[in-house]
Swiss-Prot record:
InterPro entries: Ribosome_maturation_RimP (IPR003728), RimP_C (IPR028998), RimP_C_sf (IPR036847), RimP_N (IPR028989), RimP_N_sf (IPR035956). Keywords: Cytoplasm, Ribosome biogenesis. Required for maturation of 30S ribosomal subunits. This is Ribosome maturation factor RimP. GO terms for biological process: ribosomal small subunit assembly; translation. GO terms for cellular component: cytosol. It holds the Pfam family DUF150_C. Its main location: cytoplasm. Belongs to the RimP family. It is found in: Cytoplasm. It comes from Citrobacter koseri (strain ATCC BAA-895 / CDC 4225-83 / SGSC4696).
Length: 152
């Protein structure tokens, strides 16, 4: 997925502190609004609990206070990826081959921006998703948002 320049910079800044605490930085989202939000997704082999989120929040807050890369007021949220896990990298898609995903595209493909199907393959910066029995290929740079579809 194409991250904004700010999201790329933030990812570079906070990856090491998050990993030093023993967590994987799954991804970040910066949502601009009246009150902007910096959302950080973390994970670990043992799962994530509230204390884990608090630890990462304190560590990341300290880094952001020193570096001060965000020029507007914002709320910091740290959470697990959840059942509808967001997908940010080619590695995420590869890890979840065979799983169902919902994609929202930046630019429409075949007059559609929203797609849902099963992740079939990852090849560099392209993914193949089987939608209604037909393989569709998408550039990661054209994916605005992607989430796993939870099944109960």
């Amino acid at each position: 997925m194409g991250l904004s320049t700010l999201e790329q910079k933030l990812t570079e800044m906070i990856t090491a502190p998050v990993e030093a605490l023993g967590y994987e930085l799954v991804g970040i989202e910066f949502i601009r609004g009246r009150t902007s939000t910096l959302r950080i997704y973390i994970d670990s082999e043992d799962g994530i609990n509230v204390d884990d989120c608090a630890d990462v929040s304190h560590q990341v807050s300290a880094v952001l206070d020193v570096e001060d890369p965000i020029t507007v007021a914002y709320n910091l949220e740290v959470s697990s990826p959840g059942l509808d896990r967001p997908m940010f990298t080619a590695e995420h898609y590869a890890r979840f081959l065979g799983e169902e995903v919902t994609l929202v595209l930046r630019m429409a493909v075949q007059n559609r921006r929203k797609w849902q199907g099963v992740i079939k393959a990852v090849d560099g910066e392209m993914i193949t998703v089987t939608v209604e029995g037909k393989d569709e290929v998408f550039a990661l740079s054209n994916i605005q948002k992607a989430n796993l579809v939870p099944h109960f």
